[in-house]
């Protein structure tokens, strides 16, 4: 039987989809990239925003219309957070939340043996769950390996549905992490990206820390780069930064979710830091990592956000000189405190603020890439995407292109030093230089 996966949302979802693919393959299924050829179609959903829900509904209808006889499985955050709404979707045969996904093949078989009567399997979180270790499975053409090591969130920001969809914080045990990373290294991966719903809370249950995971990965033979996913600012201490700076394999790319550059809005969001604390953290990072990238998420249109609040947020974002900003509109999530507020912002105002913040984001991105001109940096090359260039990324995840020779040889999974000579709004351009001539901390 053939199985097709459609994934929405974050890198954690992508990791989980890879795990589910491995589980179905072990059960005798073949993974297909053609939904019309699938016997089972699985949608791994996201529900961070209403637009994500809308895209999921559209995809569900389209996939059902294209393959009426397939078993349609809806899983992930939307199913867990809104089980009644998910179960009411006529296109969905089997609805399963964010737990027990290792049982999916058995649940599909149970559905088929039960006269294809619609099924729902969404156990509630109790707060005592252990970390679910799904097997890893990556396409052979991938350069970096993404590994989910943490799940759940204890923060309950006023706008966020994720604690309800994912349960409380829990972490992959270190012995399991060692096995996973060693296996990736044996498969030829030189870069590991550690992911989680609230990654900076890794190890909190047993008194450990994210540093434990990063150090373990850096010490694994064959692993040359260790990168982190999104981080909560309040968990990043100076001691942690000092320890990370002492690890040569650590990649200085920090995605620190800001959400707003206005202190009043941050307080209303139930965020646990001020703009002053956030700015101090960024300064501490830059003092330890002279060549680094700090990226962020910024929400516009949170309930009660005034024009003055937004102007403050815009000005703060500009002052931080981010490498990249992901801008998104607030959307009410049923069951969260912010959704109950009477001072919701109109769609037209959200749109205006979105445009203004995106313009700033584009300017900041172009300026960041331009700041790399003159640097010589190690670049891990990836799958060739066009005939004219080799493509790769620096440790701080700056995208780099170098011209390809006429008789193009693949550089994939190799690291070379590149002198950055030009940039545009999307990437940097340069040429390979001998390692002996490389100096990544100074411009020539």
Regions flagged by a language model, labelled:
Residues 1-201, 215, 239, 244, ...:
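Proteins enriched for Cys/Gly/acidic motifs involved in redox and nucleic-acid/cofactor modification
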Residues 42, 77, 104, 194, ...:
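Residue-level signal for inorganic ion chemistry
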Residues 156, 160-167, 199, 226-234, ...:
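Conserved strand-turn element in the central/C-terminal portion of the radical SAM core barrel
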Residues 203-208, 241, 304-312, 341:
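Short glycine/threonine-rich loop-to-helix capping motif typified by GTGT followed
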Residues 209-261, 267, 272-279:
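Acidic, glycine-rich loop-and-beta core segments that form the ion-binding/anion-interacting portion
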Residues 305, 321-322:
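Contiguous mid-protein beta-loop-alpha structural module that forms a pocket-lining wall or clamp
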Residues 340-444:
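Terminal RNA-binding accessory module
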């Amino acid at each position: 039987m053939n199985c097709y996966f459609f994934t929405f949302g974050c890198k954690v979802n992508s990791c989980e989809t890879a795990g589910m693919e491995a589980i179905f393959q072990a059960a005798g299924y073949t993974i297909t990239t053609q939904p019309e050829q699938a016997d089972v179609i699985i949608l791994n959903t996201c529900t961070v925003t209403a637009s994500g829900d809308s895209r999921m509904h559209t995809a569900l209808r389209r996939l059902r219309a294209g393959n009426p006889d397939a078993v349609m499985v809806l899983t992930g955050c939307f199913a867990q957070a809104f089980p009644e709404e998910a179960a009411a979707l006529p296109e969905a045969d089997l609805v399963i939340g964010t737990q027990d996904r290792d049982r999916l093949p058995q649940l599909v078989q149970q559905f088929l043996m039960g006269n294809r009567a619609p099924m729902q399997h969404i156990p509630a979180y109790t707060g005592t769950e252990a970390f679910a270790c799904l097997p890893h499975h990556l396409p052979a053409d991938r350069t970096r390996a993404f590994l989910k090591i943490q799940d759940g969130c204890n923060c309950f920001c006023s706008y966020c549905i994720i604690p309800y969809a994912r349960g409380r914080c829990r972490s992959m045990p270190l012995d399991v992490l060692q096995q996973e990373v060693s296996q990736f290294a044996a498969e030829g991966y030189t870069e590991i990206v550690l992911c989680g719903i609230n990654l900076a809370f890794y190890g909190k249950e047993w008194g450990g820390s994210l540093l434990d995971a990063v150090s373990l990965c850096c010490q694994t033979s064959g692993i040359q780069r260790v990168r982190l996913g999104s981080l909560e600012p309040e968990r990043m201490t100076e001691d942690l930064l000092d320890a990370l700076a002492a690890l040569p394999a650590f990649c200085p790319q920090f995605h620190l979710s800001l959400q707003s550059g206005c202190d009043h809005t941050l307080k209303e969001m139930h965020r646990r830091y001020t703009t002053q604390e956030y700015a101090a953290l960024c300064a501490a990072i830059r003092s330890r990592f002279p060549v680094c990238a700090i990226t962020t998420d910024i929400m516009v249109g949170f309930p009660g956000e005034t024009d003055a609040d937004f102007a403050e947020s815009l000005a703060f974002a500009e002052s931080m000189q981010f490498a990249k900003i992901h801008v998104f509109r607030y959307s009410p999530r049923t069951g969260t405190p912010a959704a109950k507020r009477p001072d919701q912002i109109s769609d037209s105002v959200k749109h205006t603020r979105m445009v203004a913040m995106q313009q700033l984001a584009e300017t900041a991105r172009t300026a960041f890439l331009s700041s790399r001109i003159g640097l010589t940096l190690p670049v891990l090359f990836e799958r060739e995407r066009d005939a004219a260039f080799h493509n790769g990324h620096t440790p701080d995840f700056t995208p780099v292109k170098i011209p390809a020779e006429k008789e193009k040889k693949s550089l994939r999974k190799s690291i070379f030093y590149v002198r950055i000579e030009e940039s545009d709004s999307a990437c940097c351009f340069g040429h390979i230089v001998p390692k002996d001539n490389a100096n990544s901390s100074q411009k020539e």
